């Protein structure tokens, strides 16, 4: 793919650990793949801190992750990316999804939501909140952003397929409320994207191969 100019002859991989602990053997394997491919094919690896959960991130672990990556001998072009660099873009993407009826705000309690997702042998049931007008969802998402609700009171879900054989694809949560100051953005945000929502957007922005 690199030789076909699909990526403009610039191969980019990424290593995106969450700075909530020290790197372990699983991280080392992932780093070996991302860093190794970049090195083998003359590309570059992005070191990106997955700081989407303000309750768990720690500056000490960010520092230690960088030191361990350097100690293992992998190049990251002396630049550290952060998921939080893209919070504004992710928020706009989420709003665009709502406008296109691809996401909705849900006030269903967590336990009930899990129950309504169904099982491996039964389809899930979509929340009644999903049937509200798009204008309602945009307004409630704005209320979430403005700190009107407590943690866990509601969330934003992607409108996918409640009959999917993969339960994780049954309208997954893509934004949740966390009224905890962020290590980099302080109190600028009180809603945060989930891992599965954030990473494809980050990869797209950084032009990861």
Where are these regions (language model features)?
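Active-site cores that bind ATP or allylic diphosphates and position pyrophosphate for catalysis
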Residues: 99-209
